[in-house]
């Protein structure tokens, strides 16, 4: 395939659509990006226009080819990674959506999830789908559309409607309505999919009253699904050959494809995934059991956990406390002091997630003495991100019995060397920061490239997945455990704060 020089990853996110062009050495050659409209019809409701998602995504595909000055016959394949759970229902004959896309953040189906709990379905859903009962996932969103859009249920019963997450919608549009598929990673986020049998679950379809005919075919994350002439000139057709939900794509982009390998994405919050191989582990700590890819893009399993407030705590220092001017300053101020002087910041602004699951916890600063200053508070705030990561990873290790080999990292806060070094120290494992920061797009590109022979196997990619810097842990175990014990004490005192206040 010497004439094929490039792979394109379509990265369809919550606020923008991007196209990333990569060469055979997995270097980013060019990026095109377009934002699209966020629609908030009521408090707690979030929608996107599916046609605008498609318009922005298809235009970035054409734009990235034009900007790079390449021809479409040089493109080996297109891979797709996407915002997960976001739900689209459209007419099979026309391709017209019957309603806006209901976004993963949307809370409109809380009454449906409350009824699922009241009717005693929680344990079945947990054991079958790996998920907690929450409006976050696609199943209740599909039900809402069928129940609330005039004529939708009747059309669905007649087999005239199709459902898909964003990946399914993009493949449908790219192939001009010829292919209706999803991959295992996205299917596992719908609350309609049995992650053990790897089939759509009849009982869940019955509980939510969703006809089977609406569902896409579920395929591996690395295979050729169809061809597209979008982005192709002169009749050239490009294979669409890789799909993974954004967090699973990032896991694959880090080449975490074996049990015990983990990645953490540091954004507003943190998304952590620990690969568990062929074991679907039901968490005792409120983590999600989800599907991830093995080396060949076939379905295996992972545990997923999230920290609500990570990078957002640095924004708080900047915007509310005004003790840093921008996020980049935090590293400088944190290193103006040699330690946190006993100060702990618990950034529980919206409660605490795994493993505490306390919506009544609130933010607090502990351990203040007369000598504490703003630099200590900045340092303690950065440290809180690392402590929370340890909390989740300890839950993961407890559930899985796997000892973390190393932690691969991505996201904005990974540029903070102080935070990354402290993360290594508090976890007692190496923290590896990659050269290529577009890890989610890399994952989609790898899956597409392997499916089409652009890359031979994962061993070839390992040479390209270069680590920019490894942060090795401090060997002082006594200091590490003393610090972490202080953090646990601080968290304990912030729990149920708002609940006690109400009483």
From Swiss-Prot:
ATP binds at residues 14-16, 268, 311, 315, 412. InterPro entries: ATPase_NBD, Carb_kinase_FGGY, Carb_kinase_FGGY_CS, FGGY_C, FGGY_N, Glycerol_kin. It comes from the Bacteria. GO terms for cellular component: cytosol. It catalyses: glycerol + ATP = sn-glycerol 3-phosphate + ADP + H(+). Pathway: Polyol metabolism; glycerol degradation via glycerol kinase pathway; sn-glycerol 3-phosphate from glycerol: step 1/1. Pfam families: FGGY_C, FGGY_N. ADP binds at residues 14, 18, 268, 311, 412, 416. Coiled coil: none annotated. Glycerol binds at residues 84-85, 136, 246-247. Its EC number is 2.7.1.30. Belongs to the FGGY kinase family. This is Glycerol kinase. It comes from Haemophilus influenzae (strain PittEE).
């Amino acid at each position: 395939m010497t004439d094929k020089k490039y792979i394109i990853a379509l990265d369809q996110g919550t606020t923008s659509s991007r196209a990333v062009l990569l060469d055979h050495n997995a270097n980013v050659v060019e990026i095109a990006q377009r934002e699209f409209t966020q629609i908030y019809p009521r408090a707690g409701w979030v929608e996107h226009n599916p046609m605008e998602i498609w318009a922005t995504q298809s235009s970035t595909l054409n734009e990235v080819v034009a900007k790079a000055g390449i021809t479409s016959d040089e493109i080996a394949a297109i891979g797709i990674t996407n915002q997960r759970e976001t739900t689209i229902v459209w007419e099979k004959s026309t391709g017209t959506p019957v309603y806006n896309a209901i976004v993963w953040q949307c809370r409109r189906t809380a009454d449906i999830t409350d009824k699922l709990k009241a009717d005693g379905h929680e344990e079945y859903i947990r054991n079958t789908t790996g998920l907690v009962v929450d409006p976050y996932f696609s199943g209740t969103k599909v039900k809402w559309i069928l129940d609330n859009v005039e004529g939708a249920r009747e059309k669905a019963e007649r087999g005239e409607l199709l459902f898909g997450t964003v990946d399914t919608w993009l493949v449908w549009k790219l192939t001009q309505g010829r292919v209706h598929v999803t991959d295992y990673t996205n299917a596992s986020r719908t609350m309609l999919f049995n992650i053990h049998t790897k089939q759509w679950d009849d009982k869940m379809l019955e509980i939510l009253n969703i006809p089977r005919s609406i569902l896409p075919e579920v395929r591996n994350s690395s295979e050729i699904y169809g061809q597209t002439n979008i982005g192709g000139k002169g009749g050239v057709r490009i294979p669409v050959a890789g799909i993974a939900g954004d967090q699973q794509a990032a896991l694959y982009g880090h080449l975490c494809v074996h049990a015990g390998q983990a990645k953490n994405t540091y954004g507003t919050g943190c998304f952590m995934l620990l690969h568990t191989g062929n074991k679907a582990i039901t968490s005792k700590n409120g983590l999600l059991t989800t599907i991830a890819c093995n080396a060949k893009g076939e379905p295996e399993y992972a545990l997923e956990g999230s920290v609500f407030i990570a990078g957002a705590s640095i924004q708080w220092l900047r915007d509310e406390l005004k003790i840093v001017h921008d996020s980049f300053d935090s590293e400088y101020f944190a290193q103006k002091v040699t330690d946190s002087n006993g100060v702990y910041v618990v950034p529980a602004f919206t409660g605490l997630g795994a493993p505490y699951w306390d919506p009544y916890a609130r933010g607090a600063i502990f351990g203040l003495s007369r000598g504490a200053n703003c630099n200590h508070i900045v340092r303690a705030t950065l440290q809180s991100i690392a402590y929370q990561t340890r909390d989740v990873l300890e839950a993961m290790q407890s559930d899985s019995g796997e000892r973390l080999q190393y932690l691969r990292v991505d996201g904005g806060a990974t540029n903070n060397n102080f935070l990354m070094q402290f993360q290594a120290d508090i976890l007692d494992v190496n923290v590896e920061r990659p050269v290529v920061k577009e890890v989610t797009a890399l994952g989609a590109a790898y899956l597409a490239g392997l499916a089409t022979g652009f890359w031979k196997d994962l061993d070839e990619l390992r040479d390209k997945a270069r680590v920019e810097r490894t942060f090795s842990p401090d060997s002082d175990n006594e200091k590490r455990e003393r610090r972490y014990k202080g953090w646990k004490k601080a968290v304990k005192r912030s729990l149920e704060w708002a609940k006690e206040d109400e009483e």
